[in-house]
Amino acid sequence: MKITLTRTFIALAVCLAFIGACLSPHAVQALTGVYYIVQENDSLSSISQTFHTSPARIELANYLTDNDPIFPGEKLLVPGFNGLSGTLTQIKIGLGDTPLSLMRHNHGDASAFTRINFLTSPDAIVVGQNLYTLTKDDAANTRLPVTDGMTGLELAAEQGLNPWTAAEYNSLSGPWDLIANDILYLPASGTAGSGDILPGVSALNLTALGQGKTAVFTATAAADAQLSGSLTFNVEDVDQEQEDQATTPPTPVNPANPPVLHDRYPLNLFANPDGTLGALQGVPRMTRVPGTASLLLTARTADGHSYSLQQNIQVKSEDYGYDSPMQVADNFVDPKVTVPEDDLVFKTVAPASPDKLWNGAIQPPTATPDCQTDTYGKLRSFNGSNFIYWHSGIDYCGAVGDKITAVADGTVIYTGQLDVRGNATIIDHGHGVYSGYYHQSKIEVSMGEQVKAGQEIGLIGDTGRVTGPHLHLDLFVGDVQVDSTDWLNGLYP
């Protein structure tokens, strides 16, 4: 009997050893850990940089040698994430996403999300950023924003759920643990919810933000939903620098850390022909980069509840170049002269009238549009200053008396003589879009007059701060001077 048991045990041990030898190291390691699926153009070096490790550690964890290639679709164990398990899935941060909402959507935990993405705080995520989540299953769920004043019982009644279901599904301590502006996820099979990003808002989109460019915001909202919002930019304070230079020697370069203003611009939302809501907003030329803008959205439901969302959005740097240093009369760069004039102009172009009067691309304002003496956005130095100034529009060639025409249909809302801009005309094209025509020798329109695209409105001159006759064209979008080149090319609706 003992001999039979001994032989049986030996046979079983040999069998297990044989099975273990047949298993590949990849099969053994697949039992636990965090795994990354190799993508096209990946290398061990790029993967190790993403996850703050080294190629050698990845090779060791996956039983690879220096000569072993990796292939798209292959799963690699990523070292350094002890205690976590699952497959890494790359996501692009969208409007409305937070670490907590992403955790709930993927049935994970916020600390794991922070850990695999090496985040220092929830505010560190930026719309458009590529991050990773740990995927364990593909259980369907539905997004539900929590409005102010909502209780667990109200949520349960609206969604047809047991009051404890939402709490358990979202790792809450109980039905009472709801916080306004939070985002919950509910089992898709047990809810009639729509998966709105905000209450009554099912889709949001914001084009890339670039210095001096025009951003396009769109939202798909229910008829009874009220949506409002704003964008805040960190903008270098030129006026403060002008005052500082009165007591310090001028230098030919930008200071390393110029003063910054937090400029907030409301989104001027209007209905689009397709039923969506839309807004156009200029990005200030001197927005600090690298850096982010802050988007704030508030949705109010028909019953009076509201939900607010704040997110950071990356602002791209645009290289507009430099102008040669210039010499002008001191009063033309004196803040006592320039600041009141700027205040007048920006107050004039701040309102957003409800009627959209332009249609498609705007038209050049002169008969020789390809003849330009200066372009938008170039940094400038006046009278030995730092390069803290910048050119706000396009300068078109011309002789005194050459015709100036309107770039689009609109209403004349300002005519007059200004110290820096000379004889100036400003036209309102609706929805917060304005055009400005400066340095004219003669203004040929009057306040309140309706004009058509291509209509003569004045004559080129050399009034104001100029070195010779020309037309300066400004384009304002959302109270910000923007690069009109894209508008002339018809890139905006």
For the regions a protein language model found, what residue spans apply to each?
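Surface-exposed, glycine-biased beta-strand/turn segments
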Residues: 309, 314-421
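Short, well-structured beta-strand-loop connectors
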Residues: 403-412, 445-460
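Conserved, short, structured surface segments that act as functional micro-motifs
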Residues: 161, 172, 178-181, 186, ...
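Zn2+-dependent peptidoglycan hydrolase active-site motif and core
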Residues: 74, 406-444, 469, 474
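Cationic-aromatic interfacial patches
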Residues: 187-312, 317
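Short histidine-centered loop motifs in beta-beta connectors
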Residues: 62-63, 117-118, 170-171, 415, ...
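Bacterial N-terminal signal peptides
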Residues: 11-22
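Primarily a LysM-type cell-wall glycan-binding module
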Residues: 28-52, 76, 80-107, 129, ...
